Amino acid sequence: MNESIVISLGGSVISGDPIDADYMKSFARILEASKYRRVGIVTGGGRTARSYISVLRKLNVNENVLDEIGIYATRMNALSMASLIPGSNPTIPFTVEDAVNLMNTYRFVVMGGTEPGHTTDTVAALLCERSATRTLINVTSVDGVYDMDPHRFANAKRFDRIGYREAIALSTKSSAGAGPNVFMDITALTIAMRSRIRVIVTSRDIDNLEKILKGDRAVSTFIDDDQRS
């Protein structure tokens, strides 16, 4: 059994309208069957977070408060996910350090956001760094990293593998602010680069994700030091 892996589970993947209960159950199933001894899962806020943030921003609520609201949404998703995974933590940790300590007790540790200004992708990267985990799977709304937004441009090219700096450059083009919708934020990518954490960006497709967990070839983008594309 391999040592450990961290998964950043985008909130939009599980917290849509309605909440995708079947996906959550399937996700729990493939985790249980995986070869990893320790699995950290960081959940995003999804539609719940975006809905509140969108409305309250129009009412001129400041960005720090909007971030706090987003964090509560991520923690609700985390507790929901943890309740479906046997052998996971019964309470949701508030900090990365708390999550790392829980990884010494539980095979599966699920958490949400931690503090304003940090996306859950950043939290996942910090969890990798703090727990000496070498691979981060980012499950998001696209099946990899593209040179353009694949939802807007039919001719967008998906990279099989790119380097950290190229990924950071592509992420820089995306919008900032609470609740951004990008393949991975700059801070998370910078943490991955400094600690040489391999990032695998992929979609919510459960069969595809299962292949990745098994180490099989799957639709995704690897972000690491290898500059081949």
Swiss-Prot record:
Residues binding ATP, per UniProt: G11, S12, G46, R50, T140, Y146, D149
GO cellular component, as recorded: cytoplasm
EC number per UniProt: 2.7.4.22
Activity modulation comment: Inhibited by UTP.
Methyltransferase found in the keyword field: no
Pathway: Pyrimidine metabolism; CTP biosynthesis via de novo pathway; UDP from UMP (UMPK route): step 1/1
Summary of the function given for this chain in its UniProt record: Catalyzes the reversible phosphorylation of UMP to UDP.
HAMAP family for the chain: PyrH_A
Assembly and binders: Homohexamer.
UniProt name for this protein: Uridylate kinase
Species whose genome carries this gene: Thermoplasma acidophilum (strain ATCC 25905 / DSM 1728 / JCM 9062 / NBRC 15155 / AMRC-C165)
